[in-house]
Amino acid sequence: MSTEQGIKAEFYTDKPKTIICDLDGTILKHAHVFSDLDKHDPQLNPGVIEKLNHWDSLGHTIVLMTARKESAREMTERHLRSLGVMWDHLVMGVTSGKRVLINDKLELQDQDRAVAVNVITDIGFNNTDWDGIGL
């Protein structure tokens, strides 16, 4: 295979996706005060566990990220496991400000290789057209 063929295969072959998903307000009901996180049982938002399980069964990589402090990792992982949430990576300590994903594509006219989805806080995953974005 030539270098050019290898590059095209890398960019144009359908492969499992990397799904990067926020935690509070997206996966879990939003707890607005960090110090209250361990005082209440965490709650999943509607449709979340079904979609995460589906994506996992398709071989997608699931990266959860949160503005929670690194010091809350043990508690956060315990909560997620107790709810049956599966993930590949958990990134702690990102800001709660705007998140920007930067990715490349081979040619200007090619389809974008990154997609952003914004769900309404605490509404869950049932009202999103996942098929429309290839998920």
Predicted region positions:
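HAD-like aspartate-dependent phosphatase fold
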Residues: 1-135
